[in-house]
Amino acid sequence: MDNHGVDPDYFLSEVHKLDYSIIGPNIDLNEELKILEGRKIIYTNANLQHTVDVLEKLQLTNMFTDIFDIKKANYIPKPEISPYNQFIKDFNIDPESTIMFDDIAKNLVPAKNVGFTSVWIDAGYENFSDDIASSKKYLDYETKNISNFLNQVNKGEI
Protein backbone atom coordinates (compact mmCIF):
# COMPACT_ATOMS: atom_id res chain seq x y z
CA MET A 1 0.00 0.00 0.00
CA ASP A 2 2.92 2.31 0.76
CA ASN A 3 4.36 1.69 -2.70
CA HIS A 4 1.13 2.86 -4.32
CA GLY A 5 0.24 5.75 -2.01
CA VAL A 6 -2.96 4.07 -0.80
CA ASP A 7 -4.28 4.73 2.69
CA PRO A 8 -4.25 1.30 4.37
CA ASP A 9 -7.42 1.90 6.39
CA TYR A 10 -9.32 2.94 3.28
CA PHE A 11 -7.96 -0.01 1.31
CA LEU A 12 -8.88 -2.51 4.01
CA SER A 13 -12.36 -1.06 4.43
CA GLU A 14 -12.92 -1.48 0.68
CA VAL A 15 -11.43 -4.98 0.51
CA HIS A 16 -13.65 -6.12 3.36
CA LYS A 17 -16.92 -4.95 1.85
CA LEU A 18 -18.24 -8.49 1.75
CA ASP A 19 -21.53 -10.33 1.87
CA TYR A 20 -21.54 -11.78 5.38
CA SER A 21 -24.96 -13.39 4.94
CA ILE A 22 -23.38 -16.75 4.06
CA ILE A 23 -21.76 -16.94 7.51
CA GLY A 24 -23.87 -18.47 10.24
CA PRO A 25 -23.45 -19.31 13.93
CA ASN A 26 -20.83 -21.89 14.83
CA ILE A 27 -22.37 -23.48 17.92
CA ASP A 28 -19.79 -26.29 18.16
CA LEU A 29 -16.86 -23.87 18.11
CA ASN A 30 -18.63 -21.65 20.63
CA GLU A 31 -19.02 -24.59 23.03
CA GLU A 32 -15.40 -25.73 22.67
CA LEU A 33 -14.05 -22.20 23.16
CA LYS A 34 -16.12 -21.84 26.34
CA ILE A 35 -14.45 -24.95 27.76
CA LEU A 36 -10.92 -24.15 26.58
CA GLU A 37 -8.76 -22.73 29.35
CA GLY A 38 -6.56 -19.68 28.98
CA ARG A 39 -6.73 -16.42 27.08
CA LYS A 40 -7.98 -16.51 23.54
CA ILE A 41 -6.64 -13.76 21.30
CA ILE A 42 -7.20 -13.40 17.58
CA TYR A 43 -4.18 -12.56 15.43
CA THR A 44 -5.37 -11.64 11.96
CA ASN A 45 -4.18 -10.00 8.76
CA ALA A 46 -7.66 -8.47 8.47
CA ASN A 47 -8.76 -5.18 9.96
CA LEU A 48 -10.66 -4.94 13.24
CA GLN A 49 -14.07 -4.20 11.73
CA HIS A 50 -13.99 -7.19 9.40
CA THR A 51 -12.91 -9.44 12.27
CA VAL A 52 -15.71 -8.18 14.51
CA ASP A 53 -18.25 -8.57 11.69
CA VAL A 54 -17.24 -12.21 11.17
CA LEU A 55 -17.24 -12.94 14.91
CA GLU A 56 -20.74 -11.51 15.21
CA LYS A 57 -22.02 -13.74 12.40
CA LEU A 58 -20.36 -16.77 14.01
CA GLN A 59 -21.77 -15.70 17.41
CA LEU A 60 -18.28 -15.80 18.91
CA THR A 61 -17.87 -12.17 20.00
CA ASN A 62 -17.55 -12.97 23.70
CA MET A 63 -15.05 -15.79 23.25
CA PHE A 64 -11.92 -13.70 22.75
CA THR A 65 -10.12 -11.33 25.11
CA ASP A 66 -8.56 -9.25 22.34
CA ILE A 67 -7.84 -8.91 18.64
CA PHE A 68 -4.40 -8.23 17.16
CA ASP A 69 -5.33 -6.96 13.72
CA ILE A 70 -3.26 -5.74 10.80
CA LYS A 71 -3.32 -2.17 12.16
CA LYS A 72 -1.87 -3.28 15.52
CA ALA A 73 0.76 -5.12 13.48
CA ASN A 74 1.70 -1.78 11.87
CA TYR A 75 0.28 -3.09 8.59
CA ILE A 76 2.94 -5.76 8.41
CA PRO A 77 1.17 -9.01 7.52
CA LYS A 78 1.85 -12.56 8.54
CA PRO A 79 4.16 -14.35 7.85
CA GLU A 80 6.65 -11.53 8.52
CA ILE A 81 8.33 -12.22 11.89
CA SER A 82 8.24 -8.72 13.45
CA PRO A 83 4.48 -8.67 14.14
CA TYR A 84 4.72 -12.03 15.92
CA ASN A 85 7.28 -10.52 18.27
CA GLN A 86 5.05 -7.47 18.72
CA PHE A 87 2.08 -9.76 19.46
CA ILE A 88 4.11 -11.58 22.13
CA LYS A 89 5.20 -8.27 23.68
CA ASP A 90 1.81 -6.54 23.55
CA PHE A 91 -0.01 -9.40 25.26
CA ASN A 92 2.81 -10.65 27.50
CA ILE A 93 2.59 -14.07 25.91
CA ASP A 94 4.65 -17.08 26.90
CA PRO A 95 5.26 -18.69 23.50
CA GLU A 96 5.95 -22.10 25.04
CA SER A 97 2.40 -22.24 26.42
CA THR A 98 0.69 -20.80 23.34
CA ILE A 99 -1.08 -22.49 20.46
CA MET A 100 -1.52 -20.67 17.17
CA PHE A 101 -4.08 -21.77 14.62
CA ASP A 102 -3.97 -20.59 11.01
CA ASP A 103 -5.52 -21.68 7.75
CA ILE A 104 -2.42 -20.69 5.79
CA ALA A 105 0.46 -23.05 6.51
CA LYS A 106 3.28 -20.58 5.81
CA ASN A 107 1.89 -18.24 8.50
CA LEU A 108 2.73 -20.92 11.06
CA VAL A 109 6.45 -20.98 10.22
CA PRO A 110 7.30 -17.83 12.23
CA ALA A 111 4.83 -18.91 14.92
CA LYS A 112 6.78 -22.13 15.37
CA ASN A 113 10.08 -20.24 15.20
CA VAL A 114 9.08 -18.03 18.16
CA GLY A 115 8.06 -21.10 20.17
CA PHE A 116 4.31 -21.48 19.62
CA THR A 117 2.67 -24.83 19.09
CA SER A 118 1.33 -24.63 15.54
CA VAL A 119 -1.96 -25.99 14.20
CA TRP A 120 -2.78 -25.75 10.52
CA ILE A 121 -6.48 -25.67 9.75
CA ASP A 122 -6.73 -27.36 6.36
CA ALA A 123 -9.85 -25.64 5.09
CA GLY A 124 -9.48 -27.24 1.68
CA TYR A 125 -8.72 -24.07 -0.22
CA GLU A 126 -4.99 -23.77 0.29
CA ASN A 127 -3.65 -23.88 -3.24
CA PHE A 128 -0.07 -23.11 -2.40
CA SER A 129 1.25 -26.67 -2.45
CA ASP A 130 4.87 -25.48 -2.38
CA ASP A 131 4.12 -23.39 0.71
CA ILE A 132 2.52 -26.39 2.42
CA ALA A 133 5.41 -28.68 1.52
CA SER A 134 8.03 -26.22 2.79
CA SER A 135 5.97 -25.47 5.92
CA LYS A 136 5.21 -29.08 6.92
CA LYS A 137 8.13 -29.40 9.34
CA TYR A 138 6.81 -26.36 11.23
CA LEU A 139 3.32 -27.77 11.72
CA ASP A 140 2.78 -29.57 15.01
CA TYR A 141 -0.78 -30.52 14.13
CA GLU A 142 -3.14 -30.42 11.17
CA THR A 143 -6.92 -30.46 11.32
CA LYS A 144 -9.79 -30.01 8.94
CA ASN A 145 -12.15 -29.04 11.76
CA ILE A 146 -11.12 -26.66 14.54
CA SER A 147 -14.13 -27.56 16.70
CA ASN A 148 -13.22 -31.25 16.63
CA PHE A 149 -9.58 -30.43 17.33
CA LEU A 150 -10.50 -28.27 20.34
CA ASN A 151 -12.81 -31.02 21.56
CA GLN A 152 -9.81 -33.37 21.62
CA VAL A 153 -7.74 -30.71 23.44
CA ASN A 154 -10.52 -30.16 25.97
CA LYS A 155 -10.74 -33.91 26.60
CA GLY A 156 -6.97 -34.09 27.15
CA GLU A 157 -6.47 -36.28 24.08
CA ILE A 158 -4.03 -33.76 22.59
What are these regions (language model features)?
Residues M1-K17:
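A metal-dependent, Asp-based hydrolase signature
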Residues K34, N47-L48, V52-I158:
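Asp-based, Mg2+/Mn2+-dependent phosphohydrolase catalytic module
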Residues N3-D7, L36-K40, V114-F116:
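Short glycine/proline-enriched coil/turn segments at helix->beta-strand junctions
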Residues V15-I42, N47-V52, I81:
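Short, acidic loop-to-helix structural element flanking the phosphoryl-transfer center
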Residues D9, Y20-I23, P95:
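A short hydrophobic/aromatic micro-motif that marks alpha-helical segments and, especially, helix-coil
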Residues D7-F11, D28-E32, N148:
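Exposed alpha-helical structural elements
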Residues D2, S21-I23, N151-G156:
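Short, solvent-exposed polar/charged micro-motifs at secondary-structure junctions
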